[in-house]
Amino acid sequence: KILIMGLPGSGKTWLGERLGKHFNVPYWDADEVRKIYSNWDFDQKGREQQSLRMRKLAELDEISISGFVCPLPGYRTFFMADKTIWMDTIDKSEYEDTNKLFMPPEKYDLRITKWIDENQLYNCLGDINLGTMDTQNFSDELIVKLGKL
């Protein structure tokens, strides 16, 4: 399970959708999952439920990518990511309550601090062949390649 986390508007969906499509793996977007479950509860319990829901969906496949805010360490723990990508591309979001709640992660595998050019993204991913790798090697290689952008 690969988690792409960060403030709303930081580029989680942009990156997750492209990675999912490129590698033909599921991308679970938290906003879309909330729509499916008609759950827009953003208090502590609602956020915990969303984190657990995202984990269950991500575990349906051997490799999956999920994008959601994960504002607190506990929610990140609930998700149990194999790899975490922190989209640290903005200082604050349009949602003041989320800005106040969000704690930058202490543990992550990759921190992205600038917007990624789409052509550069696809060029760096070009030689990763998911069909010849186990999930751990794929996740490791993905983090290495993205880290070079």
Which functions belong to the PLM regions below?
Residues 16-57:
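Conserved substrate/cofactor phosphate-moiety recognition/catalytic segment
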Residues 87-149:
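Small-molecule kinase domains that catalyze NTP-dependent phosphoryl transfer to phosphate-bearing small molecules
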Residues 1:
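Walker A (P-loop) ATP-phosphate-binding motif of ABC ATPase nucleotide-binding domains
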Residues 4:
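Hydrophobic anchor at the beta1->P-loop junction of P-loop NTPases
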Residues 23, 80-82, 107:
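Short, structured coil segments at secondary-structure junctions
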Residues 7-8:
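The conserved Walker
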Residues 12:
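Conserved lysine of the Walker
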Residues 44-95:
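Glycine-rich phosphate-binding loop used to anchor ATP phosphates in small-molecule kinases
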